[in-house]
Amino acid sequence: MPDQALQQMLDRSCWVCFATDEDDRTAEWVRPCRCRGSTKWVHQACLQRWVDEKQRGNSTARVACPQCNAEYLIVFPKLGPVVYVLDLADRLISKACPFAAAGIMVGSIYWTAVTYGAVTVMQVVGHKEGLDVMERADPLFLLIGLPTIPVMLILGKMIRWEDYVLRLWRKYSNKLQILNSIFPGIGCPVPRIPAEANPLADHVSATRILCGALVFPTIATIVGKLMFSSVNSNLQRTILGGIAFVAIKGAFKVYFKQQQYLRQAHRKILNYPEQEEA
């Protein structure tokens, strides 16, 4: 048995570089796993390089044998007290950084929403009136109420009320003579019902909803000043401007979608033109 073991050691070959004892007699060998045969032995230096490639800079990552899946037993020299404390601090910081980054991101979004809410209040109510209202309000109410303004605007923008109006239009347009007189042919039956695109599948919808919701107070203020300049109250003028803008924009959108619907319904596929024989 000792002779057989000695013969196996003399015949050992590194499964990384395929070198034998005859190629390098000074190389250090290691048997790190349960493998037998040609994959039993490996150079210490070759295995170290292979482990470095697998760990990719993370010295704490576990590495296993690719053949038998046995985990390599990797040990390090003992650290001194100073190095141990520094290593522990480095690990704690690495684990805490993702949570800190998430907290910073959430905090940035929150204070951006607070700032937007304050600007919106001053824009809708008036600069001086808005500042006076916020100065007299409870700070806790401001910290909770101001960031809800952009949230409510976005949620309100997500309500697709034009689609409900469009369904009612298509359902009762043939019964309302006033619609037929204003829009001739609107209540005529269509040859087929076209397939409509799913609004959730539109990749532009999210950005349009966000931009439209955040710009809405400014548009409502401008429309209110243009159409209801006789109203003295800034708040009432802005509310009326917002209602007018939503109504006018919704009417155009409903009409545009209905015309697209009719265009798709009357779509026709032509015969392929036959080529004249030579």
Swiss-Prot record:
<dbReference type="GO" id="GO:0000209">
    <property type="term" value="P:protein polyubiquitination"/>
</dbReference>
<comment type="subunit">
    <text>Monomer and homodimer. Interacts with MFN1, MFN2, DNM1L and FIS1.</text>
</comment>
<feature type="binding site">
    <location>
        <position position="35"/>
    </location>
    <ligand>
        <name>Zn(2+) 2</name>
    </ligand>
</feature>
<dbReference type="GO" id="GO:0090141">
    <property type="term" value="P:positive regulation of mitochondrial fission"/>
</dbReference>
<keyword id="KW-0808">Transferase</keyword>
<dbReference type="GO" id="GO:0051020">
    <property type="term" value="F:GTPase binding"/>
</dbReference>
<dbReference type="GO" id="GO:0039532">
    <property type="term" value="P:negative regulation of cytoplasmic pattern recognition receptor signaling pathway"/>
</dbReference>
<dbReference type="InterPro" id="IPR013083">
    <property type="entry name" value="Znf_RING/FYVE/PHD"/>
</dbReference>
<dbReference type="GO" id="GO:0008270">
    <property type="term" value="F:zinc ion binding"/>
</dbReference>
<keyword id="KW-0472">Membrane</keyword>
<feature type="binding site">
    <location>
        <position position="33"/>
    </location>
    <ligand>
        <name>Zn(2+) 2</name>
    </ligand>
</feature>
<feature type="binding site">
    <location>
        <position position="14"/>
    </location>
    <ligand>
        <name>Zn(2+) 1</name>
    </ligand>
</feature>
<dbReference type="GO" id="GO:0005789">
    <property type="term" value="C:endoplasmic reticulum membrane"/>
</dbReference>
<keyword id="KW-0479">Metal-binding</keyword>
<keyword id="KW-0832">Ubl conjugation</keyword>
<keyword id="KW-0862">Zinc</keyword>
<comment type="pathway">
    <text>Protein modification; protein ubiquitination.</text>
</comment>
<feature type="transmembrane region" description="Helical">
    <location>
        <begin position="99"/>
        <end position="119"/>
    </location>
</feature>
<dbReference type="GO" id="GO:0090140">
    <property type="term" value="P:regulation of mitochondrial fission"/>
</dbReference>
<dbReference type="GO" id="GO:0051865">
    <property type="term" value="P:protein autoubiquitination"/>
</dbReference>
<feature type="binding site">
    <location>
        <position position="46"/>
    </location>
    <ligand>
        <name>Zn(2+) 1</name>
    </ligand>
</feature>
<dbReference type="GO" id="GO:0044314">
    <property type="term" value="P:protein K27-linked ubiquitination"/>
</dbReference>
<dbReference type="GO" id="GO:0005739">
    <property type="term" value="C:mitochondrion"/>
</dbReference>
<keyword id="KW-0833">Ubl conjugation pathway</keyword>
<dbReference type="GO" id="GO:0070534">
    <property type="term" value="P:protein K63-linked ubiquitination"/>
</dbReference>
<protein>
    <recommendedName>
        <fullName>E3 ubiquitin-protein ligase MARCHF5</fullName>
        <ecNumber>2.3.2.27</ecNumber>
    </recommendedName>
</protein>
<dbReference type="GO" id="GO:0070936">
    <property type="term" value="P:protein K48-linked ubiquitination"/>
</dbReference>
<keyword id="KW-0576">Peroxisome</keyword>
<feature type="binding site">
    <location>
        <position position="17"/>
    </location>
    <ligand>
        <name>Zn(2+) 1</name>
    </ligand>
</feature>
<dbReference type="GO" id="GO:0070585">
    <property type="term" value="P:protein localization to mitochondrion"/>
</dbReference>
<feature type="transmembrane region" description="Helical">
    <location>
        <begin position="209"/>
        <end position="229"/>
    </location>
</feature>
<dbReference type="InterPro" id="IPR011016">
    <property type="entry name" value="Znf_RING-CH"/>
</dbReference>
<comment type="function">
    <text>Mitochondrial E3 ubiquitin-protein ligase that plays a crucial role in the control of mitochondrial morphology by acting as a positive regulator of mitochondrial fission and as an important regulator of immune response. Plays a crucial role in maintaining mitochondrial homeostasis by regulating the dynamics of mitochondria through the ubiquitination of key proteins involved in fission and fusion such as FIS1, DNM1L and MFN1. Acts as a critical determinant of mitotic apoptosis through both MCL1-dependent and -independent pathways.</text>
</comment>
<feature type="transmembrane region" description="Helical">
    <location>
        <begin position="238"/>
        <end position="258"/>
    </location>
</feature>
<dbReference type="GO" id="GO:1900227">
    <property type="term" value="P:positive regulation of NLRP3 inflammasome complex assembly"/>
</dbReference>
<keyword id="KW-0812">Transmembrane</keyword>
<keyword id="KW-0496">Mitochondrion</keyword>
<dbReference type="GO" id="GO:0005741">
    <property type="term" value="C:mitochondrial outer membrane"/>
</dbReference>
<dbReference type="GO" id="GO:0141111">
    <property type="term" value="P:positive regulation of cGAS/STING signaling pathway"/>
</dbReference>
<keyword id="KW-0256">Endoplasmic reticulum</keyword>
<keyword id="KW-1133">Transmembrane helix</keyword>
<dbReference type="Pfam" id="PF12906">
    <property type="entry name" value="RINGv"/>
</dbReference>
